[in-house]
């Protein structure tokens, strides 16, 4: 237990190491053992698992989804507070794969990178709605946004556009949150323009 906790950060870093697949696979084996044995803290591990769920490697993707489901079944209420961190970790992981990451993957069909995560939230309505709220609110940008901010916004928007929503309430919630965001950002932009002129 102490050994796993001591080397948790290097293992989590190794799991996301796309330049060296053997290191990535070995680290994912260690992570799997740590999670299933209860030797790692779920709050520390889940952002990495969510990032791996967006991997192009189907073995890593399914392994991460299995571990995420395992942790979600035991610690669902704890994991809600990590939505923002998980989304950003996934984006950073995608940035390590490509210069301008998108929020979808195209196999036989196009699907949102966060579809697996959304499916894990499953029947828990409040968790799904909290997830969608967090995702939508991350589209907020300041007037001084960078190219990386725009890429992140596009990554989030792709996921929102391509998620397979379960009930009508969910896209309606996204639309409502976007309206609120538009009102706030529109007012902010108007005041910036007025100050400059």
Language-model segments: residues:
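Long internal repeat-built scaffold domains in very large eukaryotic proteins
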Residues: 36-37, 47, 65-197
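Internal alpha-helical scaffold/solenoid segments in large eukaryotic proteins
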Residues: 5-75, 80, 153-157
